[in-house]
A protein has these predicted regions:
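C-terminal, surface-exposed recognition/capping segments
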Residues: 71-132
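Extracellular adhesion/carbohydrate-recognition regions
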Residues: 1-66, 115-116, 121-125
């Protein structure tokens, strides 16, 4: 069951708090643009999953009311809210191929791929579309 069953559906750019401030049950980490050109506020949700395969990490993130971060969003988290992250490697939402997926090490911010069957950590993010 999601921790925040009523997340914000949209948010205006003018109403965004400072990076690192509370927003929608988490911490505002910055802005991103999805592949469909939707601009979104990124919220790092509280807590973290550990000892999770990639598939289990995706399920865990959904249970938190969010999703695993994409590779660009993981880089955004590292750049803007590193102090709120556990060091070590964390799954991203992106597959490399059928057997491998990408992860981000929040100690250095670098990204590599690893077998999806390996157990790692995870963070969950929520992306809130921006309105004018």
């Amino acid at each position: 069951m999601p921790k925040d069953p009523q997340p914000a559906s949209t948010i205006s750019l003018a109403s965004l708090p400072a990076i690192g401030a509370a927003l929608d049950g988490g911490i505002f980490a910055g802005l991103t643009t999805k592949p469909d050109s939707t601009h979104c506020a990124v919220v790092l949700l509280p807590g973290g999953g550990t000892d999770l395969t990639w598939k289990k990490a995706k399920t865990w993130a959904e249970e938190q009311g969010g999703e695993l971060p994409s590779r660009p969003v993981a880089a955004l988290l590292f750049a803007n809210v590193k102090a709120s992250l556990q060091l070590g490697w964390h799954w991203t939402s992106e597959e490399f191929d059928a057997s491998y997926a990408w992860y981000c090490r929040f100690y250095y911010g670098d990204q590599f791929n690893v077998l999806k069957s390996y157990e790692g950590s995870a963070v969950a993010v929520r992306q809130i579309p921006l309105t004018a």
